[in-house]
């Protein structure tokens, strides 16, 4: 089992990255909450990982924090929640926000996540309620910090918007829905990661 990888970031195409670990390129899928914490391409990063083995593919998921991976593992134990849906949930909410929604039984917030219907949301409440008592309420609504713009990042609104739309579709949103979400928040000075962050924030 691969539990942790440290290497040089070669490519970023949300929600996927390519990580060079001693000459071997690992493709990883990251929730957007972890994607926001990535350094620039060419820099070193460390990720906690979870390997999902299927008949047709081996999928490697990466997380900036151990708590994100822990929640991911709890989610995929839930009936009806696969790795891709767990990725969408962790992209839409931080661990703290998800914990708060579960403890407060906020079904309406959970069902706004693509792929989470009423039955799945109810199942999540039943199976996960009470597991987040150690999470501080003061952490629930911490404002996300803005990612600084860098000259090495393409900041043209069109390419950023296109990348953001593709990422949202990969996370389970319908193309028309993804396009609407991006149009509501896109600005010329924003990177694709910032557009995705704002779009997901508005969606909830």
From Swiss-Prot:
Entries under Gene3D superfamilies matching the protein: 5' to 3' exonuclease, C-terminal subdomain (1.10.150.20), DNA helicase RuvA subunit, C-terminal domain (1.10.8.10), Nucleic acid-binding proteins (2.40.50.140)
Any one annotated GO CC term: Holliday junction helicase complex
CDD domains: UBA_RuvA_C (cd14332)
Annotated segments matching region Flexible linker: 144-155
Gene Ontology biological process terms in this record: DNA recombination; DNA repair; SOS response
Annotated region described as Domain I, given as residue ranges: 1-64
GO molecular function: ATP binding; four-way junction DNA binding; four-way junction helicase activity
InterPro entries reported for this sequence: DNA_helicase_Holl-junc_RuvA_I, Hlx-hairpin-Hlx_DNA-bd_motif, NA-bd_OB-fold, RuvA, RuvA_2-like, RuvA_C, RuvA_C_sf
Protein localization: Cytoplasm
Keywords assigned: Cytoplasm, DNA damage, DNA recombination, DNA repair, DNA-binding
Function: The RuvA-RuvB-RuvC complex processes Holliday junction (HJ) DNA during genetic recombination and DNA repair, while the RuvA-RuvB complex plays an important role in the rescue of blocked DNA replication forks via replication fork reversal (RFR). RuvA specifically binds to HJ cruciform DNA, conferring on it an open structure. The RuvB hexamer acts as an ATP-dependent pump, pulling dsDNA into and through the RuvAB complex. HJ branch migration allows RuvC to scan DNA until it finds its consensus sequence, where it cleaves and resolves the cruciform DNA.
UniProt family annotation: Belongs to the RuvA family.
Protein name: Holliday junction branch migration complex subunit RuvA
Organism: Haemophilus influenzae (strain ATCC 51907 / DSM 11121 / KW20 / Rd)
